[in-house]
């Protein structure tokens, strides 16, 4: 099915251009196979995307939640109605990540919830990657 792949892929350079053109703080949720930023030592990164994220973060802040490392598949199950990552994000915003019980979802608590939940759903075969620096202001109000 690779003949159809270019229609579904978004090159890192295109994402980088889009990110650099945005105003204000931003949060991104990327649920695709091999979606990670690969911030771990020894792993390759997309230099354009990494540069764009660093530039945005210096100026106004950015948070990126990616469903898996750059070397992993993002798992799906028909019973979930989504991938494991999207399922965990939805559950987290609906209250699973409201650890303080104050109605606010923060990047740090969403990261913790999503990572644990995805690892549980995928039997530790998928590890989300979260890129954020110094931002822990609420990003959502708990949904009902």
Regions found by a protein language model. Name each.
Residues 1-144:
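Cysteine endopeptidase catalytic domains of the caspase/legumain-like
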């Amino acid at each position: 099915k690779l003949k159809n792949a270019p229609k579904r892929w978004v090159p890192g350079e295109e994402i980088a251009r889009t990110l650099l053109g945005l105003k204000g703080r931003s949060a991104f949720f990327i649920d695709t196979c091999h979606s990670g930023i690969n911030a771990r030592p020894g792993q390759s990164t997309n230099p354009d995307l990494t540069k764009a994220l660093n530039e945005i973060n210096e100026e106004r802040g950015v948070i990126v939640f990616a469903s898996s490392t750059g070397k992993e598949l993002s798992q799906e199950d028909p019973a979930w109605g989504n991938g494991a990552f999207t399922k965990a994000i939805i559950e987290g915003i609906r209250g699973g990540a409201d650890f303080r019980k104050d109605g606010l979802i923060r990047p740090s608590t969403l990261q913790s919830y999503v990572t644990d939940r995805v690892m549980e759903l995928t039997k530790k075969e998928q590890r989300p990657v979260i890129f954020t620096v110094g931002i822990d202001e609420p990003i959502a109000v708990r949904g009902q």
